[in-house]
Amino acid sequence: VNPVFIVGTQRSGTTLLRLILNAHSEIAIPEEANFLMPLLKRKYLRGGLRGDLLSRIASYLQVNPQFKLWNYDSSDFILSLRSRENISLRDLVDGLFLSYCRAMNKAGWGDKTPSFFRKLDVILDLFPDARIIHIIRDGRDVFDSWRKMDPTKNYVGVVALEWRYKIWKIEKSLAEIPDGRKMTVRYEDLLEKPRETVSGICDFCGIPFEQGMMNFYETSDRYVGEHHSNLIFGPLDAANRFKWRQTLTLGERRIFQSVAGRVLRKYRYETEDVAMRFSDALFVLRNLTAGLPLRAFQVARTKLMIERAVQKGGSAGLRDVGKMPKRRN
């Protein structure tokens, strides 16, 4: 089974798709691997990892709170890193995921780290036969879901701009990939016609469809903690689409569409016959003034802390990485 990478914006259904694929007998997909972001660099692709840096990476992984969410015994992999003098970046990444794969008694592995879309060039150099699945969701539902999980995301103009930008970046990365190795899936299609959509994904991944994939929710508590949406602990429900129609105010709908309407239409999402008012423009300006610096600070702070943690071989000290699954693998 070729490695499968799921990418997308936050709150777009990446976890749902991960759990569906993870319910297949041949594929194991752990929690997010943002902790690998500092290592997915061309200098490591060319020169590999060796000496003191490799030792620090082993220590970094051992205490990383996000890696702990993978919920398996990684001690053998950590020991193997400590016993080596050098390792290629491919062997490190492949070995890490294979160690999880073996613990799950699966034949192949995948990844669900939405932000890896920024590193697709490096990932495809590491794994030329990898399959990339981009899952997209109506941005207005993304905004509504995100602000429910994190009150600091309650800036409709900022989220609309970020959603539009990230999809542009994903599209730009995917444009360099041959058609047979990339696929775009709408979250809404996954809910409306699950059997057909999942069968198509299986064909793309080169694996047979298994009915057990539709019962993914029966084992969700082995693979995700309660910090995720409650929806992934139950069966697929088409009613969970397009909630923005009831939850967003008219002003929020006007603003989101004014900022990202072109992208909504491109992916066949409904748009309304509304135009931004002067009061909306002022609201967006206040949104951007307050929300953009906050979002930029959050992103920069997280990146800096992870980079420092790798170099020091310690914990990044990040908070709110999530809760452990209820059941141990």
Label the predicted regions.
Residues G48-L49, L53-N71, N86, F117-I123, ...:
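Anion-recognition interface
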Residues T9:
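P-loop (Walker A) phosphate-binding loop of NTP-binding proteins
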Residues F97-P235:
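PAPS-dependent sulfotransferase catalytic domain
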